[in-house]
Amino acid sequence: MTSQSIMLLVAFLGVLLALAYPLGLFMAKVGDGTAIRGLGWLLKMENALYRLAGLDTQSAMSWKSYAIALLVFNTLGALFVYAVQRLQAWLPLNPQAFGNVSPDSSFNTAVSFVSNTNWQGYGGESTMSYLTQMLALTGQNFFSAATGIAVAFALIRGFSSRSAKSIGNFWVDLTRSTLYILLPLAIVVSVALMGQGVIQNFSAYQDVALVDPVTYQQAKTTADGQPVVDAEGKPVMETLTAKMQTIAMGPVASQEAIKMLGTNGGGFFNANSAHPYENPTVFSNFIEMLAIFLIPAGLCFTFGRMVGDMRQGWAVLGAMTLIFVVMTSIVMTSEQSAHPAMQALGVDQTTTALQSGGNMEGKETRFGISASALFTAVTTAASCGAVNNMHDSLMPMGGFVPLVLMQFGEVVFGGVGTGLYGMLIFAILSVFIAGLMIGRTPEYLGKKIQSYEMKMASIAILVTPTLVLVGTAIAVLVESGKVGIANPGAHGFSEILYAFTSAANNNGSAFAGLSANTPFYNTMLAIAMWFGRFAMIVPILAIAGSLACKQRLAANAGTMPTHGPLFVALLVGVVVLVGVLNYVPALALGPIVEHLQLFSH
């Protein structure tokens, strides 16, 4: 790591902590339902929304009622997003006259945005109208994030309640999360990004003449975007000359803000946050990274405040930060090292005052190695998936890091809400293991952890590895899966493993070398995204309901402290161990083999 990388990482974590602490305390008030001083006007708006919807806000929900309401709301959201895409050609705010999106791509995109994954098998600026981007996709960026916060609130109430039958009201949690947290933050970040040059308009795309025409070759494709191959299976190339360039416009800043704050990640443009209209400067890049981690980090303090012991929140945040710093150091070091293939060509990859050095393939020169590597770690530690560089061009160990961060279960800060409740599931597993070692019934925050909680926790932990490994196995076995591989060998396998890892863990980033906009991958990845999201949420709500019914016991001499360095070390060990055990064989076939092959020559 260079001194620049170290300084950037320290500055990032310092600013994050300074902002996340007060936000976490504020979110605790939102979760508790208490009145917030100075925001009486928002309370009036909130109550007006309840009256408009005919909701009884005093009606408490059991965990089953909460889960049903959540599933119904998100299913209706998916149907709405699907319908908007399928009717896009006849709807307004479509200056480029884009046609209707295909059924399989619409299905994949609807599930993707509702599940907070934002996997994109399409190019936003060449597929989606402004209305689709704003009404369907940006809308779900808010609602999917609010759903995650609501589930986190419900689980926290399970720990903090005493012999309660309710874990809250889903509709209230959804409304308050959107109104008090997501909307205000999105407005602030949108304005900040516009100040840095992120565009926000409804203009038609602009056609401009190039100063120098560009002649280039590209693989020929069919009408549906599939590569044309010759008799030997090699891609057929065609020579093209570009004299004009079409510059895409659109309401980008408003979508960019919630894309980051909600750990959604779906870009307005195909290049995502590598595009200069989404992320034009190093300062906008820093803002976007902060926005990704801000709410997940703040929720750790929310957890501590709502359970009545801030040390618990610090312990969870400490475990997350420790893993994050180690993994970020690996990707920074890996990307700063010289690429052997470039060395063989005599390319200068040393770090100087005039260049970042290292592996600059697939990276933006305005960001360089340090900011690109940090963004890579941030976006995959959180279930965001936005990218400011091409992950497919990372060094083998550089690509190993985002894969592993996702395979930990997106609990290293993780998504909005999902990171906290995912880490709390690992905390439950940790105290259970500790209880087995000392022969005592495990407790966490005064609640006994018994067989029911462990069964539900096991389901929540195992559902995503099952989806990832089974999906990857099917894709490499069937012809429709193998035809999408552009890079044979270990890297091609890594691309498929990355796709299913990203989908099942609701991240959304990709190794872009995989041709994933096909009926096979659109369907398979949509299944992984849906069950990766909701097959985890339901058992977590079941745990919340079970814990809420229990008395909160006072700590005694035999109670294991869950706020000190020993527990943090145990929690980190359990997260790493479960991730390693689940995925080591698959990782050995992908990035590890690729690393050995690259450096063996």
Curated annotation (Swiss-Prot):
GO terms for cellular component: plasma membrane. One of its GO terms (molecular function) is potassium ion binding. The chain crosses the membrane at residues 6-26, 65-85, 136-156, 179-199, 283-303, 313-333, 367-387, 397-417, 419-439, 458-478, 524-544, 566-586. The keyword Ion transport applies. It is found in: Cell inner membrane. Its main location: membrane. It is a multi-pass membrane protein. Keywords: Cell inner membrane, Cell membrane, Ion transport, Membrane, Potassium, Potassium transport, Transmembrane, Transmembrane helix, Transport. The keyword Ribonucleoprotein does not apply. Belongs to the KdpA family. The system is composed of three essential subunits: KdpA, KdpB and KdpC. Part of the high-affinity ATP-driven potassium transport (or Kdp) system, which catalyzes the hydrolysis of ATP coupled with the electrogenic transport of potassium into the cytoplasm. This subunit binds the periplasmic potassium ions and delivers the ions to the membrane domain of KdpB through an intramembrane tunnel. This is Potassium-transporting ATPase potassium-binding subunit. The gene is kdpA.
